């Protein structure tokens, strides 16, 4: 190990946190995670700094804590090491470390409430004689010292977690093999979490987004329940007003979609429940199935959702045929496309410029602004 720096200053030894390695587990390298705090009135100087020895690639930040998750493994199983560093009033506080069985899907697999960390993981590994490989899922509740105080294990055997989201005392997570169980878990008693409902539908959601107070939007893929083959991109709306009886109220299928960055980068999704709008960019393979060479098949879909009518398409835009790109749009350009609205105007923001559309006039294009080269 080396001593890390913040700017030109070496970090003091008592501000470097070294978690105790778990016996018989390996790590994919070790690097420093350095966090600094600055005051707004004097931003060129750090008020405090903390370093953690970690290989973490998943992070979650709550109101008063920073969590990092590192995958560790031995020859039979995978675990996730969690490190917590507290922060309050511009100062970092003592850390804590713990671990759970399995691996996290992404940062939405973690959530803090009432000084407890709730985690969902996919657990897989070999038995003692390496004759059988198994996969299941677990839900764990850790206290402020990151010790497990409650858990549910062996959920959805043979499946893996595809999406998760938490709200208050309820956790929602999707597992998948050939069908899509959406679980709702009661977390009101941290020591005794329980599954309240399990909804089985075809396909699976890759991303969950709370859509107003009592609805949950799922975006992912529709699949054939017999073969598991993808048949289209799916948007599902779930009624979560009663977590013990979650229902899918509507679904919308986009055919022939090959890839969608928004499923893995939530910043790429426009979600505006008050406007009843959501949108995302997606791609369709042409003759060449290399994603980096499909420069003529990028689109933006804008949809609405109302309780009475369900999902309704508002606009499909062929982005790379627009005057901004004129057929020369790259995959990197596509990944940076964003949709926003201001008042009654919808704007498509890209690397090459902005295009505006009037929502009240059936999304009539009203103007284009190209960035100067």
Where do the model's predicted regions map?
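Beta-sheet-rich non-transmembrane sensory/scaffold domains
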Residues: 1-373
């Amino acid at each position: 190990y080396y001593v890390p720096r913040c700017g030109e200053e070496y970090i003091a030894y008592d501000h470097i946190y070294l978690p105790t390695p778990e016996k018989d587990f390996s790590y994919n390298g070790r690097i420093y995670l350095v966090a600094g705090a600055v005051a707004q009135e004097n931003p060129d100087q750090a008020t405090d700094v903390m370093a953690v020895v970690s290989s973490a690639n998943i992070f979650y930040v709550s109101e008063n804590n920073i969590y990092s998750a590192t995958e560790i493994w031995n020859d039979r199983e995978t675990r996730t090491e969690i490190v917590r560093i507290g922060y309050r009033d511009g100062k970092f506080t003592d850390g804590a470390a713990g671990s759970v069985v399995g691996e996290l899907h992404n940062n939405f697999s973690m959530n803090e409430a009432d000084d407890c960390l709730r985690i969902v993981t996919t657990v897989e590994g070999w038995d003692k004689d390496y004759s059988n490989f198994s996969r299941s899922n677990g839900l764990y509740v850790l206290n402020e010292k990151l010790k497990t105080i409650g858990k549910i294990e062996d959920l959805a055997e043979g499946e893996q977690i595809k999406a998760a989201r938490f709200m208050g005392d309820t956790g929602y997570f999707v597992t998948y093999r050939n069908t899509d169980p959406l679980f709702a878990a009661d977390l009101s008693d941290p020591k005794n979490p329980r599954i309240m409902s399990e909804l089985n539908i075809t396909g699976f959601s890759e991303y969950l987004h709370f859509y107003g107070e009592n609805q949950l939007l799922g975006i992912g893929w529709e699949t054939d329940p017999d073969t598991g083959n993808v048949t289209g991109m799916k948007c599902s709306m779930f009624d979560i007003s009663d977590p013990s009886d979650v229902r899918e109220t509507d679904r919308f299928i986009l055919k022939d979609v090959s890839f969608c960055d928004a499923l893995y980068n939530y910043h790429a999704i426009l979600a505006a429940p008050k406007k009843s709008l959501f949108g995302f960019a997606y791609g369709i393979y042409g003759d060449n199935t290399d994603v980096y060479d499909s420069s003529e098949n990028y689109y933006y879909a804008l949809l609405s959702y109302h309780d009475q009518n369900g999902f309704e398409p508002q606009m499909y835009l062929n982005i790379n045929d627009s005057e901004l790109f004129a057929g020369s749009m790259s995959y990197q350009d596509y990944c940076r496309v964003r949709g926003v609205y201001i008042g009654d105007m919808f704007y498509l923001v890209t690397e090459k410029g902005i295009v505006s559309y009037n929502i009240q006039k059936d999304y009539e294009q009203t103007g284009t602004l190209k960035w100067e080269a």
